[in-house]
Amino acid sequence: MRKITAGLFISLDGVVEEPGEWHFPYFNEEMGAAVTATLGAADTVLFGRKTYDSFAGAWPDREAAGGEDAPFAKALGDARKIVASNQKLELTWRNSEQLEGDLVEAVTVLKNEPNGNIALSGSVSVVRQLLAARLLDELHLLVHPIAVRNGMRLFDEAETPIPLRLISAESFKTGVLNLVYGPAESTADATYEDAKAFLAQPDQ
């Protein structure tokens, strides 16, 4: 079964919208390595339409320009790219296709194919649905030390909590935290009566 990972730039107050407006001051070699590791380990990239349009509007030109980011751009171009959208799309970036049918059903089929990892970058609406369906194996959050204070947040209002477990954590020189979470079983019921035993006792 294929592993599905999602990587997101996120502010301290949970904003994931328009990261290009606030995250570049924190981008360094550590973050570059983290992003490359997530996308580079996948042979398939799953996008929402807006994120795909952003990538397709930049990375083919960067590959053609032959600059220092050209190898990464080529790897993205060579990967299979699947775009989730309710609209009929004209996809011009090579190796791109539109996801057909229900997102959760289609991704379930993809997950069971005998290929490499599937990665998402951004694509918040897709990430939300895959988290809720428990199809996401790893959620990579690059938490920036800034409160953006406006914009869409990763988790929307819903009735059902999504329990997660921390797989790994590291801090970058810029103050960014690289947190990797995976799905967890539902937390047990507990109250303050259960918690108070763990409070530090004052010195007598």
Whereabouts are the PLM-identified features?
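Portal/gating segments that form or line small-molecule/metal binding sites
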Residues: 1-135, 145-204
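A contiguous pocket-lining binding segment that forms or flanks enzyme active sites
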Residues: 138
